[in-house]
Amino acid sequence: MDITFNTGLMGSGKSKKLIDDYLIDPKEKVALSVSLTEDTFSRGKIESRDGRSLRSINLNRDQFKQNISLLEIIIFMTNTQTIYIDESQFLPKETVEKFVSLSESYHVPIHFYGLDLTFTGELFDSSSHLLTILPSENINRISRGCEASKCSKIAQYNARIVDGKVSRSGETFVEEKSYYLALCSDHYYNDEKII
């Protein structure tokens, strides 16, 4: 299976890893980035926290037919030999299933990069699907430390912070900017102010 899933918490370096992997890959390749607001086929950019960026083509999570059409165009009409997808957690499970099917049918590797957990501690549907179907050697977990002050534990949760405290309820997909921290379980489940 030529499919990988690179997953970690917010700020763990997934986009940095995608850019690194993309730049050292000698094959013809294309980078795609999943968006909640931009149209499929529009130009996008994958940015890492270290300031580096990579041009990409946007996939809108709600435009299933256009996303499949785009992938088919990439596979059938270009010389693309590898596909990199950033923010894959935003894709619906059905889109990931179709992408996996196309990848296997036409032997074009796809590398997914995305979060596994929502801020409520539940798996994203697409991430759950990838974690279920892929063998462990095709899953790369990228870890990072807890962002709570003076904590040296490994973070396990993406915490949405509201009024300085962890919020564990609300809509998963919000278009306005929210504030998130990567926290260990002790700080995630502690109801005291984090910041």
Curated annotation (Swiss-Prot):
It is an enzyme of class 2 (transferase). It comes from the Bacteria. One of its GO terms (biological process) is thymidine metabolic process. Zn(2+) binds at C146, C151, C184, H187. Its main location: cytoplasm. GO terms for cellular component: cytosol. Its EC number is 2.7.1.21. Transmembrane segments: none annotated. It catalyses: thymidine + ATP = dTMP + ADP + H(+). The active site is at E87 (proton acceptor). The keyword Transcription does not apply. ATP binds at G8, L9, M10, G11, S12, G13, K14, S15, D86, E87, S88, Q89. One of its GO terms (molecular function) is ATP binding. Signal peptide: none annotated. Keywords: ATP-binding, Cytoplasm, DNA synthesis, Kinase, Metal-binding, Nucleotide-binding, Plasmid, Transferase, Zinc. InterPro entries: P-loop_NTPase, Thymidine_kinase. It is found in: Cytoplasm. Belongs to the thymidine kinase family. Homotetramer. This is Thymidine kinase. It comes from Bacillus subtilis subsp. natto.
